[in-house]
């Protein structure tokens, strides 16, 4: 393997780490950029799983204190911790069920540049609409522990829609939260928590299906991609939490729309 191959692995790891938690669609970017740089690997599916694990690990590290407190609270029968754990599972289960049943059909039918471009534009327009509603700043829920069953269900449904490449899991769940009365900052933080079981579940499922593709010749490239995703996700998650506390998501909406139009213009 040459140096260019490892550079491509690093580049895709960075793209995964940056785009996974921004409302701009990591899957869409990986599809587009993977084709653009002609990245091919005998274990391409395994590579995608591993770099997603890098992003998951970054979130777990950043929220380690809250995660430990949550686990301890659940084990000690703390009602607040147990309620929050149930809320997260309610948001997680719809996508877990639909993903397990239809993920292969979704990938076979929807994983193409036309769908990605369309979803980017439509998602961008929805974000602009949500951010510019007259009641957009009248949120009732400012703390993730106050998120209720109604909000959890709406966010869970939104996450199902995000299975369409180009939609963005984080974007859909944040918008779902905001539409149900959760503040932008709280919706963003909840989206990160929800990402842990969602991405971990998807990674375990994909790994169980594709572990036989693992080849020791690509271990170094996989480790490079994993490390790049982990470090870039650490930076992005921290930055996004600070950003959404003071700014709207409109800048990401315009980026999505512009990228979608560019994709249509070159295809």
UniProtKB/Swiss-Prot annotation:
GO terms for cellular component: plasma membrane. One of its GO terms (biological process) is peptidoglycan metabolic process. The keyword Transport does not apply. InterPro entries: UppP. It is found in: Cell inner membrane. GO terms for molecular function: undecaprenyl-diphosphatase activity. Its main location: membrane. Its EC number is 3.6.1.27. The chain crosses the membrane at residues 4-24, 43-63, 84-104, 109-129, 147-167, 186-206, 219-239, 243-263. It catalyses: di-trans,octa-cis-undecaprenyl diphosphate + H2O = di-trans,octa-cis-undecaprenyl phosphate + phosphate + H(+). It is a multi-pass membrane protein. It comes from the Bacteria. Keywords: Antibiotic resistance, Cell inner membrane, Cell membrane, Cell shape, Cell wall biogenesis/degradation, Hydrolase, Membrane, Peptidoglycan synthesis, Transmembrane, Transmembrane helix. Coiled coil: none annotated. Signal peptide: none annotated. Catalyzes the dephosphorylation of undecaprenyl diphosphate (UPP). Confers resistance to bacitracin. Belongs to the UppP family. Bacitracin is thought to be involved in the inhibition of peptidoglycan synthesis by sequestering undecaprenyl diphosphate, thereby reducing the pool of lipid carrier available. This is Undecaprenyl-diphosphatase 2. The gene is uppP2.
């Amino acid at each position: 393997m040459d140096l260019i191959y490892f550079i491509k692995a690093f580049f895709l790891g960075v793209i995964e780490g940056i785009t996974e938690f921004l409302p701009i669609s990591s899957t869409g970017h990986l599809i587009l950029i993977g084709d653009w740089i002609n990245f091919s690997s005998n274990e391409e599916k395994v590579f995608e799983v591993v770099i997603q694990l890098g992003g998951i690990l970054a979130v777990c590290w950043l929220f380690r204190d809250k995660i430990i407190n949550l686990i301890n609270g659940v084990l000690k029968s703390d009602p607040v911790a147990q309620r929050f754990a149930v809320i997260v599972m309610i948001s997680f289960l719809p996508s877990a069920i639909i993903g397990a049943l239809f993920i292969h059909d979704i990938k076979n039918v929807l994983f193409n540049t036309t769908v990605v471009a369309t979803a980017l534009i439509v998602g961008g327009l929805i974000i602009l609409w949500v951010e510019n509603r007259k009641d957009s700043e009248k949120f009732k829920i400012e703390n993730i522990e106050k998120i209720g069953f109604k909000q959890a269900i709406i966010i869970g449904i939104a996450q199902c829609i995000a299975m369409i490449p180009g939609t963005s899991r984080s974007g859909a769940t944040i918008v779902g939260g905001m539409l149900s009365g959760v503040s932008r900052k709280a919706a963003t933080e909840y989206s990160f928590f929800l990402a842990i079981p969602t991405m971990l579940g998807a990674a375990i499922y994909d790994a169980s299906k594709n572990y036989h593709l693992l080849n020791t010749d690509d271990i170094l490239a996989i480790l490079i991609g994993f490390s790049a995703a982990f470090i870039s996700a650490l930076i992005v998650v921290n930055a996004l939490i600070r950003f959404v506390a003071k700014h709207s998501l409109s800048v990401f909406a315009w980026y999505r729309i512009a990228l979608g139009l560019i994709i249509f213009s070159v295809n």
